[in-house]
Amino acid sequence: WSWFWYYATGKAQATVEGWRAREAKAGRIYACGSESFGGFPFRFEMNCAAASASFQSNQQPVEIKARNILVAAQVYQPTLLLSEFHGPLTVATPGQAPDLVVNWKLFQSSVRGTPSAPERVSLVLDKPVLDSVTNGNARTLLRANHIEIHGRLAEGSVLSQPVIEVALRLDGALAPDLHPATAQPVDAKIDTVLRGLNDFAPKPWHERFRQIQAAGGRIDVTQARVQQGETIAVGSGSVSINPSGRLQGQLRVTIAGLEPFLKRIGAQQIVQTSPTVDKLAGALDRLSPGLGNVARQQVGANLTAGINMIGEQTTLEGQRAVTLPLRFDDGRTFLGPIPLGD
């Protein structure tokens, strides 16, 4: 048995080196400051200290570093790779100080399949924090209690017309500077299907988006549930990428607790200062000075009632709710008539 284990470990080392050599030819360089193999008798383990990944083929070269990565597989289940990452993880232009720093309490991944033909990939993070760093000053972009991302090859293969199912789970996630809607903790369960890829070879995301658009691909949101405080939303629909590389499409969304959500995002001010209301207020002011401002106030004060009249009345999880379209129009987002931003 020991002979078999050492033989298999040697084959694993050769496989890793062969994979690194192939990736290096494409400008993707993976390295360890030091590495060791172990796990005898029932596991194969590779420990990579001072791990780094350098992507030289990107339009803007990127270097990613992590303190330590442990990869393991059971002898009796060699096509299931389990990994544990130790931070911090940094993202930087090669030779420069980090632009992004990620820390976490626990970060694990699993990959089922082979390196050339993965079937399922899962990422699980406890207490992740993503910081942007400028001139040594850190600003939190994202933090959460728990994040899970699961991907599965539903159709095709990684080399030909793959259709990818992606499931996202968020617990207590917030992005303070992204948008007023994400400044408070969010719990979410979102299941999607990505169609339109030619293959899943590593490439910059802008190239991948162009590929999806050219193939008439889309993202199907098969089911989604998002909760923030007393606001609950569920929905489904499809979104595509237009020739400008922006999102285009619509989800049908049912929302309970709409009014607190509108207050959080400042919907009243958004509507009162929209170009349409500006034109109306200007015309009314020409008829009677001050009338335009009265109209603005009425529009804002009656916003929730107006949306409830436009939307379809229903119930959601025992609460009064309204169903509205969540539209993506050339990258702009609208909840019913309310612009949410780009």
Please provide the spans of the model-predicted regions.
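N-terminal type II signal-anchor transmembrane helix
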Residues: 1-17
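Membrane-interface amphipathic/juxtamembrane segments adjacent to transmembrane helices
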Residues: 16-28
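N-terminal beta-strand/beta-hairpin edge segment
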Residues: 25-157, 224, 235
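Extended terminal
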Residues: 33, 208-218, 224-226, 231, ...
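Extended lipid/amphipathic-ligand handling interfaces
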Residues: 35-37, 66-76, 102-116, 139, ...
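Flexible, membrane-facing loop/turn or short amphipathic-helix motifs
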Residues: 52-62, 89-100, 127-142, 172-183, ...
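Short, hydrophobic/aromatic-rich segments at coil-to-beta transitions
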Residues: 119-122, 162-167, 216-223
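Gly/Pro-enriched, hydrophobic low-complexity segments
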Residues: 161-167, 174, 183
